[in-house]
């Protein structure tokens, strides 16, 4: 699909589905055994014979300040058990967790080289109870979805040197400009999430609280993808009085849980009907679209008539006078019915010709992030075989960095561009943000003393701890008398509020990441950077350590090349390296990539590259021409415009006929008067 097609409706379609569901897609998984902690702000669990320790703090930024939960019976009170945190052991990372019940958490742990997902086992029929949680690493997945939109090395923020020191990162803007750059504060697209009865009954186990926690954790994970992105890269000189478009994400303003099906067969919450996805989204827009939200999202667990469809969204345009759709959409009228089409939908159930099965956490993140991206204005980068003038810049070959994140084809991430947005994608979303952020984006929930983050004006912050296990920090976020630090904020701090000595290991080493143990310095609460292990030591995926960095296999000193993916489909599933002259070729020995690893146009299966994810694209206006009723609806909706065009064409036609007649008369008059040596010139009516 070419970028100039300016598509407005995006289908995220699963091209190839496997029938053995969870165990096929997750090659290695294990139950999680959570351990009770004596401190509310710490969670312990075991996974694959390793102990994980995560320090938690409340996750406020995912919520709007007026957050509410409704069912069909009215407003509900649901406790907030959502957290972000820092992984302390076995290695540094960042966590997004939600507590389903006591000592039961779901969410994701983001490490520099992998992500650990924790999710309930009951949707996959691995258990009938709420309690059992299954864990798996992304590296053990064999998915049929594009993995390129997920957090990778350059998109997830880590503080490896000091995972306990959680100072909020502020955008560097002079204080005299802060009051003039509202978008630095108004950085959240407010959401209304509507969970229909299918999602409520299947994923929520008929419990409003569980549904709410599922949805909040989902948006928190999506924010981990969006908020690190700087949409103004290369355009900082054009900011002109506003702040940088960074830390732009989502906040939930309202959750609506439909705890029983609607009796009307035409209602979007009808449980018996099998919907066409376009019709479902349209009915949802009539019922729930609203100017009070940036986006309104239908979350369902139903399948559709269109096999393998997982989501549908309207793409946003940068100007209000252009076609409505996506974020901050204006009001539209269809056949006398008013609707706001700032709507999208996603399902948590995959449907193939062979079977249906629930998506895993990773797949849900991809579907939702993909649809939100289109709602923000992103389309696909042009394909290499297109005639788009931007194809060279936005879809470079492997020799020039590889395909970008918004490529139509999945990428593993070997090339530099695989984790970046192309100039085309950045421009599209940036243009939409420039035109619309001020109309419907709102301020991220503000911080305060007690959120576990050491911010400007604070010396410490005990966060959610309410016990008196540590008396280093008072309720005003000031250090107690005689205290030098707080162990809840500084890893090199003892329980007696003093600095650890210079032999205390504050960050265990990880040989696979080429890092040795980091030790405290004895005069600071911060943990110094971890020193490197010896050069030449083996690290991840057959790589080699050099100056504390894990070089990929192809970049080992003994090989001296670059990692790449062979573009030739016949060679794409072999281990390839790029020579200094730019040629990407397989390494000797016929070394093949394992199943599930990304290749040039999808992922490898049985040593072949299989094309997996396709976005079927249609223009929004074409929806109404699908049927005869759609044509009549379109005519009724746009009758004034059609009438103007019709009469304009008639007027132009009459004008042309009159002008032709006048010109013909002039020529005849001039010819017949020539013998009398007189010339009759007819006045030009023009």
Curated annotation (Swiss-Prot):
Propeptide, residue positions: 22-177
PROSITE patterns: ADAM_MEPRO, DISINTEGRIN_2, ZINC_PROTEASE
Localization of this protein: Cell membrane
Source organism, top-level taxon: Eukaryota
Gene giving rise to this polypeptide: adm-4
Protein name as it appears in the record: Disintegrin and metalloproteinase domain-containing protein 17 homolog
Cofactor(s) the record lists: Zn(2+)
Gene Ontology BP terms: cell fate specification; membrane protein ectodomain proteolysis; Notch signaling pathway
Knocked-out gene: effects: RNAi-mediated knockdown in a sup-17 (n1258) mutant background causes sterility with abnormal oocytes containing endoreduplicated DNA and impaired spermatheca function, and production of 2 anchor cells. RNAi-mediated knockdown in a glp-1 (ar202) constitutively active mutant background restores fertility.
Manner of cofactor binding, per the entry note: Binds 1 zinc ion per subunit.
Peptidase M12B domain mapped to chain residues: 187-445
Known EC number: 3.4.24.-
UniProt signal peptide: 1-21
Stored SMART domains: DISIN
